[in-house]
Amino acid sequence: ELLQKHKRDSWIVFTENKKQAKEFNKIINKKGYKSAIYNTDLDNAEREENLNNFKSGNLNVLVSCTALDEGFDMPEADGAMILSASSSKRQRIQRMGRVLRITANKENALIVTVYSSNTEYVKLKEESNRYQLENVPIRWQKMK
C-alpha cells in the first residue's frame, strides 16, 4: 500500500531478515511490481544480475535485509522503505544514505520507516537533525 501511495521510480526495501525479504518480495510481485531479492543466499552471478536489473530500470524494487547496508552506491533509487527499525544508528544512516544521493535525474528521495512505537519515532526524528545540518531538507509525516 505504501509503495502505491508514494509513487517513486525505484525503491530499496530493507527488511529484518531473509525470510521477511522473501515474503515481502512475493507479496509485491503479486501486486505487479518488478522486484527481486538481494542477499547472501544468492550466488554472486544472481546478485549481480539483480543489481544490474535494478540499476538499469528492469526492476523497480530491490528487497534486502543487510546485504545493501554498506558499500553500495545506489543513486538510481529514489525511495527507501525500512521495515526493520534497527537499534544501530550507523545502520540506519547507511540505509538512508543509499537513496539520499542527488543525481541529474533525481531532485529528492523518499524514505519511509515503519516503526512500532512512539519511542522509535522520537529517536528517528532526533537523528534527522544531523541531515538538516548537512543541508538535506527533511520533512516528517506521521502516517497511521
Model-predicted segments: where are they?
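Conserved helicase ATPase core of P-loop NTP-dependent helicases/translocases
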Residues: 10-14, 19-69
